[in-house]
């Protein structure tokens, strides 16, 4: 067992490291939005919490479906059937377009979800505006997720990581300008975050597409070799594999995120406290998620190479390692809960509301690790 762990863990870390950095860069968008809006007003922070819970549920559910490309492309890569990967990517883009239409429709008419929150008219108006703005970035996000799946499948996550880090550095000045105003622009508060995110989503998509078009490594896949109309058989295969993934993502995320809609009934302070804790919980989730994505990549490549025994060994090594890491993280969160909360610099009332929830964040780390790692092993 120890020999197996010593063999498999370095491979996991080499893949999961760039994934984790990239995921944290993306999640830092949310941390940054929360921290910067918290300094603007409690109403805007509450609007961000309500709108964010709706957006993340839609986004994660839909991107979960297109993530089915990763194990398919991973098995083709492991089997050295490189020329078939390009067609799968093209069909993935068609699927992303169809799903984007659904997602944009939901985000553009969010009133049915926001009615659950029973928030004040001011908070609801800002939440609606946030969602209608960020809907413009969803098609780019969906297309980008197809390219992320491709890079994960062929063990090239670092390229996406660099794009995500670049986006983070662009997000900081955009957020400051759009949230607080300046240079003849009025302060926008929470909706300003949405505009910044939309700009970066489109920049990411165009940059990733250009890298695939120009990079010599990708030429063997033939992604841009020809135009492919929608193939109902391939689309159905992708959707059939991806729908359970998207549904599992949706259930997991909404069980936590949609709580914001119910907590909104308790008032702005309670909702703002929940937003901070939910935000921190999302950041912590990136560690088991990155390790699990790396596991899925190695498992799918091993299966494609007709090495089922190796796939099983990698799966067990990852399950043990990921769970151990997350137990340690849970303990650290509980011990350092006050310094972690102080990073958000919330008002005293919000701080008191948030601190009581830290025990739950620390406690569920072990179950999160077991669940997400097992799920990605099965998807591989």
What are these regions (language model features)?
Residues 4-35, 39-40, 53-72, 96-104, ...:
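N-terminal transmembrane alpha-helices
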Residues 42-53, 127, 131, 194, ...:
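Small-residue hotspots at the loop-to-helix junctions and early N-terminal turns
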Residues 19, 23, 34-35, 52, ...:
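Transmembrane alpha-helix boundary and packing residues in multipass membrane permease domains
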Residues 27-46, 114-121, 177-188, 250-283, ...:
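Helix-terminus/linker motif at the lipid-water interface of multi-pass membrane proteins
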């Amino acid at each position: 067992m120890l020999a197996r762990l010593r063999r498999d863990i370095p491979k996991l870390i080499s893949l999961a490291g760039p994934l984790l950095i990239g995921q944290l860069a993306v999640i830092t968008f949310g941390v940054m939005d929360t921290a910067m809006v918290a300094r603007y007003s409690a109403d805007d922070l509450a609007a961000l919490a309500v709108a964010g819970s709706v957006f993340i549920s839609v986004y994660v559910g839909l991107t979960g479906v297109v993530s089915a490309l990763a194990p398919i492309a991973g098995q083709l890569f492991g089997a050295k059937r490189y020329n078939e990967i390009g067609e799968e990517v093209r069909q993935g883009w068609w699927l992303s377009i169809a799903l984007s239409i659904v997602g944009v429709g939901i985000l553009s008419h969010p009133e049915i979800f926001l009615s659950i929150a029973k928030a004040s008219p001011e908070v609801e108006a800002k939440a609606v505006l946030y969602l209608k703005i960020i809907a413009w970035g969803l098609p780019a996000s969906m297309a980008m997720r197809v390219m992320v799946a491709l890079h994960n499948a062929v063990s090239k996550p670092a390229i996406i990581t660099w794009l995500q880090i670049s986006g983070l550095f662009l997000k900081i000045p955009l957020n400051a300008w759009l949230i607080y105003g300046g240079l003849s622009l009025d302060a926008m508060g929470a909706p300003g975050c949405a505009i910044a995110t939309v700009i970066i989503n489109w920049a990411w998509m165009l940059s990733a597409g250009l890298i695939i078009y120009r990079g010599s490594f990708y030429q063997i896949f033939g992604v841009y070799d020809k135009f492919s109309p929608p193939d109902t058989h391939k689309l159905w295969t992708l959707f059939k594999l991806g729908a359970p993934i998207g549904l599992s993502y949706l259930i997991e995320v909404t069980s936590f995120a949609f709580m914001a809609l119910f907590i909104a009934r308790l008032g702005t302070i309670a909702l703002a406290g929940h937003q901070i804790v939910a935000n921190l919980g999302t950041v912590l989730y990136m560690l088991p998620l990155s390790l699990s994505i790396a596991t899925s990549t190695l498992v799918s490549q091993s299966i494609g190479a007709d090495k089922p025994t190796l796939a099983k060994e990698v799966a067990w090594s990852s399950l043990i390692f990921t769970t151990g890491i997350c137990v340690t993280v849970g303990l650290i969160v509980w011990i350092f809960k006050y310094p972690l909360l102080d990073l958000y610099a919330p008002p005293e009332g919000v701080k008191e509301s948030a601190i009581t929830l830290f025990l739950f964040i620390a406690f569920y780390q072990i179950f999160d690790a077991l669940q997400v790692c097992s799920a990605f092993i099965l998807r591989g």
